[in-house]
Amino acid sequence: MSSRGGGGGGRRGGRGGGGGREGGGGGGGGGGRGGQGRGDLGVVGERQGGGRGAGERGGRHDAPRGRGGVAVGAGAGRQQQQPFHAPAPPSGGGGRGGVQVQPNAAARRPVGGGRGGVGVPAPAPAVAVGALCGEMKGKMVVSGGAPPAGQGSSLAAAQGTDNVKREPSQVAAPAPAPPPATLPPSSSKAVTFPARPDVGTIGRRCRVRANHFLVQVADKDIYHYDVVITPESTYRERNRSIINKLVALHKQFLDGRLPVYDGRKSIYTAGPLPFKTKDFVVKHINPLRGNQREEEYKVTIKQASKTDLYSLKQFLVGRQRELPQDTIQALDIALRECPTSVNFTCDRYVSISRSFFSQSFGHGGEIGSGTECWRGYYQSLRPTQMGLSLNIDISATAFYKAQPVMDFAVQYLNIRDVSRRLSDQDRIKLKKALKGVQIVATHWKEKSIRYKITGIPSAPMNELMFDLDGNRISVVQYFKKQYNYSLKHVNWPCLQAGSDSRPKYLPMEVCSILEGQRYSKKLNEHQVTNILRMTCERPAQRESSIIEIVNTNSYGNDDCAKEFGIKVANQLAVVDARVLPTPRLKYHDSGREKVCNPSVGQWNMINKRMVNGGCINHWTCLSFASRMHVNDIRMFCEDLVGMCNNIGMQMNTRPCVDIIQGQQRNIEGAIRNIHRQSSEKLDQQDLTGQQLQLLIVILTEISGSYGRIKRICETEVGVITQCCAPKSLQKGGKQYLENLALKMNVKVGGRNTVLEDALHKKIPILTDRPTIVFGADVTHPSPGEDASPSIAAVVASMDWPEVTKYKCLVSTQSHREEIISNLYTEVKDPLKGIIRGGMIRELLRSFYQETGQKPSRIIFYRDGISEGQFSQVLLYEMDAIRKACASLQEGYLPPVTFVVVQKRHHTRLFPENRRDMMDRSGNILPGTVVDTMICHPSEFDFYLCSHSGIKGTSRPTHYHVLLDENGFKADTLQTLTYNLSYTYARCTRAVSIVPPAYYAHLGAFRARYYMEDEHSDQGSSSSVTTRTDRSTKPLPEIKENVKRFMFYC
């Protein structure tokens, strides 16, 4: 059973469906000379040395369909049961035909090699090493002497596929060793981000307009003053009213200065005030108390610091790395002062974060469930390469409609009969929707008092009792006695204001929702559709709207802007850009089109076959659509199977068991029943051990069942599903079936397409060495869901050099915690000692198990963090990545490139008025990249629009490099990111964000379904204990036969 360096291909490949695990073809085993094992398959139980042949990557380049995949076959031998090994292995030779092992981040000194073999590290003293692979238990000792007889080289076992020879046509020239990994600083204050290495040059040059307006500032000293208002107020609107009144009443004490206020604890002035500290007294009417007497407030103003513009100017020209945040903040507040002022002469704006909203902008309207759309604009001052720029964009969001609470409840709950008692399910739903909303009580004629809703008690008004003068009285009786008011909806519950210990009960029918309150809860599908329809604007229309905002705001005439010497240009910035070349995509050789050249970011499957079609032998269909006849469902399944087989999959034409019509009221029972029937049928056919591979589910006509189906199937039953909406199914069409087939293929382990340059190892940095690409994201619960945890998802590529298959892991963490806490973990066990785990460690180990190679590089795309979190996230998460790597092998520190992916920004790019520079929707072309003028003055960032617009204005994605140990140039990272956008599995279009980040986003949202409980009453609790308990509750475990595939697609 001795294996040589270049063995044959996998022997399992058959006629079935091309690539994947079944693909045969040329590939080499990886055993060292004299080692024991099988060079073609590496079967579990064989001794170390053998690797798997072509297997996972397909077989001969010229093989017909059913014989393998594309030309990647040469020898990525998998070594079953061989994890990352420990510190330096014993010296010895490699297998015949091997190539020089490239060093990892940690330097190694070659001391010898076998015939045609490899250099190995210097011998080290014996050390006990914990086995890191799941199948291997216990401990082993690696010594510095000669290998034991019959075991071959430990280096071949530990690094076997680093020295496996590939087909000559696919081996790129040896790349220089990556730069050594560096440890992150111990404090976020010491974090510095990499400087821009250069400016990109690849691509067709063009010019675009950006919604950035150049800002010039006079050279004035800016003073920062701390403000303390007593008694303390948390309402910004009230604080602004108090400060505005102070400025109006006490001008003589301010030396003619016009201060600007942030609404909290800071005031800024252009020049000093005539005092260091001063107290003022301001009388103000509190609207929450109604039309009562004025309240007296003490306002203390104390000088905090002085800033000048020199540091800002130095930063803008790249001579200073630290941003003078105080200066930027003062100028930003000065530009925001006019629209936030309660004395603003235009229609009143509602300020939310950096945006301003008003009904005067028009185009709004009701969007359903008691809500309406308000339009507005976003404004932010940003340091850029061209200097300070004011980023202005059109914005829109949902607001509560100003109306009686009863009207809102009827619309939100879709209730027709208000005389009925409100169900507990509806009460909880309404409670979550109204928590935190300000209302005004209307049963007093002489005054109006505002309240904030804190809850809805479970008892109806006629049963809700409280003590009054030593007697028990109901809310209904109290209103009759106190106000001579006869309540109508006595079967409905009250609203609660105040705390649980001192509650105030208010009947819904005497309360109205105040205008101008943002609806921050999750929008339903109907609301999303309506708000998108109302706000969708073509690029030319959006550009005109932005210019109109600038002209309306008239910054040149604004008193605060004049006070601080600020001048804002009234024209959009014209920016140099490039359109990157489109990558070529490889499809299966059995199709008429073996290589595809996408056009304007899209293509189709006509005359093409999946590069690695998956095999589905056992499937069935379960329908919950009561209005669809079973014959229609049967015809749909036949069409879907036909499509799958036509474009490269191998799918059994007959279901494992016949289609079953399930009942919506018993979803779980129907799923378990069809799974049990399928298992029994397979056992009857002597297919024991095999299981249902795919369950096609026709959803109910009523929304809400999708998440429950996914949770049951993926965490309890253990079967991959493809859900279909009845509406989409009835429309049908070839395109719909094709999209379903693409999703189904990757869910069962296939590949739809791969980058041609990846196959030929022509992508710099990605394909010169084994590289793993990560994507990470954190999703947070909707505002108001203060008892729900945040969910983190991390995906990692499991194939190389193709980089198309991604495994996904998910975990819960503390409520609204952005840093991913489960990247690396250590738990002390009294019996086993320290148990190491975490998502990075598991994914690195999975990569090794799938490819037989250790990643020599890491590229980490991190989604979902804002600029203010950059340092903290990088510091913590890089530390976790380092520890995860080192826990697998001493000294294992592959270089990392850490890139933040930002989609939620407000930069928009508009094309010049040339038809060859825009797509059919009027947007910039896919591949448009900008890394000058509107980008960071010195750091490594760029805007990339990788997708073609469909409706509205395309939003480019902002990529910001926080760490780069791989030495990327601008062109290399921009091209890699753009090329990867063509590998997204669910459609034949380039997508707007890099797929690993997209997949992490999908994975995190999928996991939300595993624990969502719409009818839980805990979401409204203000208890810290409840929040903590819920946040640490782990997710249910995803079944192993589901987790190993891209189930989340």
Curated annotation (Swiss-Prot):
Residues 1-101, 144-192 are annotated as: Disordered. CDD domains: PAZ_argonaute_like, Piwi_ago-like. SUPFAM superfamilies: PAZ domain, Ribonuclease H-like. Residues 694-1012 form the Piwi domain. Residues 1-53, 66-76 have a biased composition (Gly residues). Residues 144-160 have a biased composition (Low complexity). The keyword NADP does not apply. Residues 404-515 form the PAZ domain. GO terms for molecular function: RNA binding; RNA endonuclease activity. GO terms for cellular component: cytoplasm; nucleus. Residues 54-65 have a biased composition (Basic and acidic residues). Coiled coil: none annotated. Gene3D superfamilies: 3.40.50.2300, paz domain (2.170.260.10), Ribonuclease H-like superfamily/Ribonuclease H (3.30.420.10). InterPro entries: ArgoL1, ArgoL2, Argonaute_Mid_dom, Argonaute_N, PAZ_dom, PAZ_dom_sf, Piwi, Piwi_ago-like. The keyword Protease does not apply. SMART domains: DUF1785, PAZ, Piwi. GO terms for biological process: regulatory ncRNA-mediated gene silencing. Keywords: RNA-mediated gene silencing. Belongs to the argonaute family. Ago subfamily. Probably involved in the RNA silencing pathway. May bind to short RNAs such as microRNAs (miRNAs) or short interfering RNAs (siRNAs), and represses the translation of mRNAs which are complementary to them. This is Protein argonaute 12.
